[in-house]
Amino acid sequence: MDKLNNSIIRLILTPENSDTMFESRPGQYLNLINPTGVTRSYSIANDYSLDGHLELHIANMPQGELTHWLFNEAKPGEQVYIRGAAGDCFYVNSDHQPFPILLVGTGTGLAPLYGIAHDALRHRHEGNISLFHGGSIPERLYYMDELRQLASLHPGFHYQALVLTGAGTDDRIQQGDIELAALNSIDPLTIGQLRVYICGAPEFVQGLRKKIFLKGVRSSHIFCDAFVTRKAAQS
C-alpha cells in the first residue's frame, strides 16, 4: 500500500491461494471486504494473470468507512476478502480490428483506464489509443510520468492530463475542460468504429456519455464505470 498522491493510495492484493482466485480483466471491478464486513467496489488497474496480484487505486473519502480503515488502521499483510470480478468496462477485440479507443476519466477513474490501456497495448492493438485524465487541480492527478513513458514507447498511444485550474508551468498538464478535450479528439472519419470508455463520478460519466452519443458514437461502443460515494452511517 503506497501513496499515489495526497489523497489516493495504490493497494496491492495478493491471494493466499492462487488456485481459488476468480478470473478478472483489467477495467472490471471487485468487491473489497475488510475484517469487520464493510464492503466497497473498486476497479482493477492491472492484469492479475500476468502480475499475480491485483492493483486498486483508492481515494480517501470523507466519512468513508472502508477508506478510513485503509488509510488509518490497516497494516501491510492484513487479511481482506474479495468478491468478483464484474462489469463490462474492459478491452475486447477478438477480431483484431484496428478501431480507435478513447479513454476518459477523472480521479481514480484512471484505475480501470490504466488497466485497459495496458491490456490493449499488450494485445498489440493497431488503432490509436487516447487517454484523457482530469482533476480539479494538479495535486489530484497521478501516474503522469508512467503514462508519458508509455506514450513514448508506443506511438499509437496518446496521453493528456488536464486540470481546471493551477496548471502553471508544468508542461505535463494542460489547463482546460476534459469533456471538451475528449469530444474535440474524436475523428469524424473513424467515429463509426470508435470505442469509448468513461470512468469517474456518476454525473461526469452520465453527462459525457450523453454528449459522446449525441456526437455520433454508437451506444454499444460506449462503456462506462461510475464511482458512487457511500458515507458512513451516522449515530
Regions found by a protein language model. Give the residues of each.
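Ferredoxin-reductase
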Residues: 1-78, 135-137, 164-166
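Short, conserved phosphate/pyrophosphate- and ester-handling motifs at nucleotide-, phospho-/glycolipid
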Residues: 27, 109, 201
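Short, Lys/Arg- and Gly-enriched loop/turn segments at beta-strand edges
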Residues: 38-45, 87-95
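Helix-loop module immediately N-terminal to the HCX5R catalytic loop
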Residues: 76-91, 181
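Conserved beta-strand elements of the Class I
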Residues: 100-104, 197
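Histidine-anchored nucleotide/phosphate-binding helix
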Residues: 112-122
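Reductase modules of NAD(P)H-dependent flavoproteins
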Residues: 128, 132-235
